[in-house]
Amino acid sequence: MADADDVRRLARALPDVTEIDSAGFDFRVRNKGFVWSYPERTPGRPRVIRTDVAVLYVGDEAEKQALLLGEPELFFTAPGYDGWPLVMLRLARVDADRLAELVTDAWRMRAG
């Protein structure tokens, strides 16, 4: 099972990646975010940076829905992400190989 350190290791190994200083992790390529910590928002409370959940760029709404419907134990979304090609990934439930695939795919789509 993965954690924030695994995300950092994978993202830092990719070409042309910039790490943004944050309370969690935040990685970009060509000024476009591809993986970052989930900023959980609860009405009436301060935002909480969740390093146990990664926000991943997935390219389009079709891919987002496929991931959400196909693997609900791994992926979820929140109302603030409606209309955005982003999913949240529960790091504790994903294995290292799948995490590497997801981070690399997100990077590739944003770098291209």
Predicted regions and their residues:
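Charge-dense, helix-prone N-terminal extensions
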Residues: M1-G112
